[in-house]
Amino acid sequence: FLKKLGLASVTLGFSPALSFANMADVKKIPQNIKDNLTSYKDVTSYNNFYEFGLQKSSPKANAHKMKIDPWAVEISGEIEKNKTYALEDLVKLASLEERIYRLRCVEGWSMVIPWVGFSLSVLLKKLTLSSRAKYVVFETLYRPNEMEGQKSRVLDWPYIEALRIDEAMHPLTLLCFGVYGKV
């Protein structure tokens, strides 16, 4: 039921036009990390967003073609009232935190990244969930004219992922707005 959110963390993390969060206000969560952080360069240039193409370098090369202003998140489904949040309002719903998590790709590679965001549960608690709600579904934006990878048939677009409600409400589940102190 969270629609058009799938690319928010990628595109926003690197857009000076949308730098509305004061990073001095970001709470750094103390963590015992044994591994080194993955470099900012690697985090921002080696990733899978097939919306922009099939190569690891495609998102960095093609994401600039996507219109990101204005950006809104549509929320609908098993909730009391459908809601649309402008990004600048969504990011203000809670104090931002920096959390260092290891991203593990199904392909077998991983990165240790300082993410910026807040617990997804904060947003979900602001919505009145129906007793029938079982999943939180994330659906990416579908604009093949801006996201050329969506013209391919490698996936059935738009891309959809989901979490069970208990997974989505877990305090470690992060709604991410940026990385490396950049929002």
Describe the residue ranges of each PLM region.
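Structured, non-membrane catalytic/scaffold regions adjacent to prosthetic-group chemistry
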Residues: N22-V183
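N-terminal export signals
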Residues: L2-A21
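Generic low-polarity alpha-helical segments
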Residues: F1-L2, I160
